[in-house]
UniProtKB/Swiss-Prot annotation:
<dbReference type="GO" id="GO:0006526">
    <property type="term" value="P:L-arginine biosynthetic process"/>
</dbReference>
<dbReference type="GO" id="GO:0042450">
    <property type="term" value="P:arginine biosynthetic process via ornithine"/>
</dbReference>
<dbReference type="GO" id="GO:0005829">
    <property type="term" value="C:cytosol"/>
</dbReference>
<protein>
    <recommendedName>
        <fullName>Argininosuccinate lyase</fullName>
        <ecNumber>4.3.2.1</ecNumber>
    </recommendedName>
</protein>
<dbReference type="InterPro" id="IPR020557">
    <property type="entry name" value="Fumarate_lyase_CS"/>
</dbReference>
<comment type="pathway">
    <text>Amino-acid biosynthesis; L-arginine biosynthesis; L-arginine from L-ornithine and carbamoyl phosphate: step 3/3.</text>
</comment>
<dbReference type="Pfam" id="PF00206">
    <property type="entry name" value="Lyase_1"/>
</dbReference>
<keyword id="KW-0963">Cytoplasm</keyword>
<dbReference type="InterPro" id="IPR009049">
    <property type="entry name" value="Argininosuccinate_lyase"/>
</dbReference>
<dbReference type="InterPro" id="IPR029419">
    <property type="entry name" value="Arg_succ_lyase_C"/>
</dbReference>
<dbReference type="GO" id="GO:0004056">
    <property type="term" value="F:argininosuccinate lyase activity"/>
</dbReference>
<dbReference type="InterPro" id="IPR024083">
    <property type="entry name" value="Fumarase/histidase_N"/>
</dbReference>
<dbReference type="InterPro" id="IPR008948">
    <property type="entry name" value="L-Aspartase-like"/>
</dbReference>
<comment type="similarity">
    <text>Belongs to the lyase 1 family. Argininosuccinate lyase subfamily.</text>
</comment>
<dbReference type="InterPro" id="IPR000362">
    <property type="entry name" value="Fumarate_lyase_fam"/>
</dbReference>
<dbReference type="InterPro" id="IPR022761">
    <property type="entry name" value="Fumarate_lyase_N"/>
</dbReference>
<dbReference type="Pfam" id="PF14698">
    <property type="entry name" value="ASL_C2"/>
</dbReference>
Length: 477
């Protein structure tokens, strides 16, 4: 994500910074100024920085540190700066290091000495921690909206395929028949847990560090609860050292994002397999695919392939943040400037991947007959035959061996169990009678028999879809 404002001016002036010039006897090296600047990427949360400053100024006026006139000048100036940024006329300066000082400097240019009073009672340490939390909270809400859209798309597709039979797999080998709707509901369940994790993460993100100042708090009579209320935070941080120094909330988000991407990657892998000429289970519309520069016949599932690949970068973003934080003593350290890009990258990647999936899933077209034919291969009803014998008094292990021998015959004759004659089946057990074909060896009998909560029978899948819609209402209430 980039703002529409101008890129940072990389020319660092030959003077000490206005932020700390009194202490230093020589100018910051031009390369060091550029090397240590973060405005190239932290300008992304200018909205949150301005919102935090407006709330801070409002609170300072409430407690008497600023006059109402000073507060109004600051708010008007910040609102104008936001408009400049969004119009692309704001000049970002690298010598001002970050989003905070760029905005504060411009504010002072516009309203004079009152602009220099804005930073009273706060530090960039608690300011940036607040900005990140505000920004991440907004992004979590957007991502939750995309998750909801994808989940609804899955339920819609599942509802159309309650009776569509396909092979279920273990070890990527045919195992038992399931319905396509049931398979899609498995994806849905993964995303429900992802939603719950993200919502839980949001609770810890939504704590306000502002007021912690550099590390020990401030001597001014601030009203943190009032500022938190203005910014929509549920509570304030309890310890100033912790508030300015830890980024575990960002790590937690990246962990939740990694799990989302892991699930999307698994779904992508299945879609890639299913669209191959060897499976042909589903068709992805052309708008989500690309071709080959040399092979005219190719239709490549680039969207799921790219999402499968992008999962790795989000995992890397998580490890980057963990590694960044693991060796830091309290409180704030410059290391933490490196927290933003791994967080931003994870946010952007998850958002883009969910957008692509939310658009693509409802457009999938299953090849119903091909799925059914595939379920007829690989002896998918073998377990049902074993269960049939158990119900007639055979111990399960003995039934397992009997059916294994029947499968061996089927392999030798290149026939499914349902294609063997009754006489052939009875050579393995005289308990097998003509009803075996209707009760155990048809695909419909197999899926219908699994008629319990969590099972693949069409009746249960319909009930699960109904429950899922209610769960979504509760999740996103």
């Amino acid at each position: 994500m980039t703002t529409s404002s101008n890129p940072p001016n990389s020319a660092a002036p030959n003077q000490t910074s206005g932020m700390w010039g009194g202490r230093f006897s020589e100018a910051t090296d031009a390369f060091v100024a550029e090397f240590t600047a973060s405005v190239q990427f932290d300008q992304r949360f200018y909205k949150q920085d301005i919102a935090g400053s407006i709330a801070h100024a409002t609170m300072l006026a409430k407690v008497g540190v600023l006059t109402e006139a000073e507060r109004d000048d600051i708010i008007e100036g910040l609102s104008t700066i936001r408009a400049e940024i969004e119009a692309g006329t704001f000049e970002w300066r690298i010598d001002l290091e970050d989003v905070h000082m760029n905005i504060e400097s411009r504010l002072t240019q516009r309203i004079g000495i009152t602009g220099k009073k804005l930073h009273t009672g706060r530090s960039r340490n608690d300011q940036v921690a607040t900005d990140i939390r505000l920004y991440l909270r907004d992004e979590i809400d957007d991502i939750l909206g995309l998750l909801e859209r994808l989940q609804k798309g899955l339920l819609g597709l599942a509802a159309k395929n309650v009776n569509t039979i396909m092979p279920g797999f273990t070890h990527l080998q045919t195992a038992q028949p399931v319905t396509f709707g049931h398979h899609l509901l498995a994806w849905f369940e993964m995303l429900v847990r992802d939603t719950e994790r993200l919502q839980d993460c949001r609770k810890r993100v939504n704590r306000m560090p502002l007021g912690s100042a550099a590390l020990a708090g401030t001597t001014y009579p601030i009203d943190r609860a009032y500022t938190a209320e203005l910014l929509g935070f549920e509570a304030v941080s309890e310890n100033s050292l912790d508030a300015v120094s830890d980024r575990d909330f960002a790590i937690e988000f990246n962990a939740a994002a990694s799990l989302i991407m892991m699930h999307l990657s698994r779904m992508s892998e299945e879609l890639i397999l299913w669209t191959s000429a060897q499976f042909k289970f589903v068709n992805i519309p052309d708008r989500f695919c690309t071709g080959s520069s040399i092979m005219p016949q190719k239709k490549n599932p680039d969207v799921p392939e790219l999402i499968r690949g992008k999962s790795g970068r989000v995992f890397g973003d998580l490890v980057s943040l963990l590694t960044l934080m693991k060796g830091q003593p309290l409180a704030y350290n410059k290391d933490n400037q490196e927290d933003k890009e791994p967080l931003f990258d994870a946010i952007d990647t998850v958002r883009g991947s969910l957008m692509a999936f939310a658009d693509m899933i409802p457009a999938l077209v299953p090849n119903v007959e091909i799925m059914r034919e595939a379920a007829l291969r690989g002896f998918s009803t073998a377990t049902d035959l074993a269960d049939y014998l158990v119900k007639k008094g055979v111990a399960f292990r003995d039934a397992h061996e009997i059916v294994g021998k029947a499968v061996a015959l089927g392999v030798a004759e290149e026939k499914d169990l349902s294609e063997l004659t009754l006489e052939q089946l009875q050579q393995f057990s005289d308990l097998i009678t003509a009803d075996v074909f209707d009760k155990a060896l048809t695909l419909e009998a197999s899926v219908n028999a699994r008629d319990h909560i969590g099972g693949t029978s069409p009746k249960q899948v319909e009930a699960a879809i109904a429950r899922a819609h209610k769960r979504l209402e509760q999740l996103y209430a």
